[in-house]
Amino acid sequence: MTAEQCQRCNKNAVEVISRKELFCAECFRVFVMQKQRKQMMSDDYYRDIFKVMYKDKIRSAEEAEQQNKNSTILIPLSFGSSSLMMLDIVHLTLLEQKMQHQKTGFNVDVLICYRESNDELLTNIQSNIKELSTVRYSENKDNIRFHTLCLDSMFEIDKELIDQVVLHNVEFTGRQVSINESEHANLSLQTVLTSCPNRSTKEDIIDFVTKHLVKKYAYQNGQKAILWGHSMTRLADEIISCVVKGRGAQISSKLNTTNLDVNYGSRFKNLYPLKDILLTEVDAYCALFDLSKYLIKYELQDSLLVNKLKKEKHIGNQRLAKNMTINELARKYFNDIEGEYSNVIATVLRTGDKLDEPLATLGEKHCRICKSTVHDDVSKWLRDITVNVGQPLESQLERDLHEKWATSHIGLETTAYYQLRDRVWEQGDDVDLCYGCIVTMQGVKNLNVPWPKNNEQELNEVLAEYSLE
C-alpha cells in the first residue's frame, strides 16, 4: 500500500494531519513558521525589531547598524513544548537572515526561571542549556544567550522594599506594613508557598512571581519585547481561567500586544507569537524535529502524528479532577476537545481579543499584588453580599465550645491573624487589591503575604543571575 503524499509539496510522505490537511515534516515546519513569523511582523514596532535594517530615508547606515545591534528580545524558556518550538523558529529566522544578509536584525536573551527544588531538575536544566548553546544553536551562539534566574530572587532584596500585605477578613480591604528583620531573614518563595494550603493559590503565586521577574529582567536589560511561548490552546485556557478566578477584567490587558507595558516603565511590549498555533501542532513539531529530548516535566501529545509516539495511555497517572487547579481543569478541557472541536479554542481566543478593558471608575489605581488596574470598589461589593460578623456567645454550651476552639490549632492561628490585622490596621497604610487577588489571598493562611513594593526602586534592584554549575 502506497503511503499518502503531502498535499502541499506532493512529494514526501505524510507525517502530520492537522486542520484536515496532510503535511510532510518540512511542509509542516513551514506552516508553523509562517504563523509564528506573521505575529512577529504584526506591526511597525515588531518589524523594526526583527527585520535587518539598512540605510534609508529615516536612518543612516550607522544608525541602522546600531538598531540591528540594540534590537534584543527576551524569551522565557520553561522547557515545555511551546517555548522550545518558539525558540527553535527564532533560531531558524536568524540563520535565514545570516544567509540572505550576512548579518542579523536582532539578538535573543533566553531566561530560564527555576525554583530551588532538587538536584536532578537543576542538572537537567544545566545539561539542556549546554547542549542547546553548543550544539543545536551553535551557529547562533553570538546571537542567542542563555541566563538563569532563581524565583527566590523575588524576595532577595532589601528589607525596605518588601511589605507585609494583609487582607481584612470582614471589610475585604488591604493594608501593608514593613516586615521586620527576622521575617526578612527567613523569607523565601518556599515560605510563602507553605502558607498556601490549596494548589490553585500556590499556582497563582508562582505565576505572579515568574511574570514579575521576567518583566523586571526585561526592564533592567533593555529588551524591546518579551516573546511568551503561549499557544492558542494555552491562551484560551488562560482566558477561561481568568473568568473563573474573578480576573475577567484583566483579559484585555493580558492579551495586549499593541501597547508598551506601563507597569514596567513602558520599555517593552509583550508578544504571543504562537497565538495562531494549536498545542497539538506545537507538540507535533517538537516530536518531528527532535526537541522532545529537551522537555522537562512535560509529555508530548501525538494526536496529529501519523506515526504515534506511544501505543497506550496510562490512565492511572492522570490527576483526578478534584485535585486539579483551575488552570489545569481549563487545560484538560481544551486538550480533550482540541482534536474534534479546535474551532472552539479559536473562538475563545477571538472573543478574548475583542474584549476592552473596563472603565476605571476609581482613577489610576493598581492592585498591590498583580499590578492590574482596579476598576471598581470590589471591597464594598463584597461587603454588600456577604456577612462575616460573628454573633455574641449566649449559652454556657456556646462559651465552652468557643473555649475549646480557641485552644485548637485553627483557633490559635485565627487569634494570631487578629493580632496581626489589628497591628497592621493601626500602623499600616491602605493598599488597593483587585477582586482576583482578594480571592487568592483568602486561600493564604492568616490572609497575608510578604510582597515587593510596586515602585521604581524595586524595579531597579539588580537581579543576580545564578550559575547552575
Curated annotation (Swiss-Prot):
Sequence similarity: Belongs to the CTU2/NCS2 family.
Physiological role: Plays a central role in 2-thiolation of mcm(5)S(2)U at tRNA wobble positions of tRNA(Lys), tRNA(Glu) and tRNA(Gln). May act by forming a heterodimer with NCS6 that ligates sulfur from thiocarboxylated URM1 onto the uridine of tRNAs at wobble position. Prior mcm(5) tRNA modification by the elongator complex is required for 2-thiolation. May also be involved in protein urmylation.
Protein name in UniProt: Cytoplasmic tRNA 2-thiolation protein 2
Metabolic or biological pathway: tRNA modification; 5-methoxycarbonylmethyl-2-thiouridine-tRNA biosynthesis
Localization (cell): Cytoplasm
Keyword Chaperone tagged: no
Presence of keyword Aminoacyl-tRNA synthetase: no
Gene name of the encoded protein: NCS2
Family annotation (Pfam families): CTU2
Cellular component GO terms, alphabetical: cytosol
Keywords on record: Cytoplasm, tRNA processing
InterPro entries: CTU2 (IPR019407), Rossmann-like_a/b/a_fold (IPR014729)
One of the GO biological process terms: pseudohyphal growth
Single GO term (MF): sulfurtransferase activity
PANTHER family assigned to the protein according to its UniProt record, in alphabetical order: CYTOPLASMIC TRNA 2-THIOLATION PROTEIN 2
Main location as per UniProt: cytoplasm
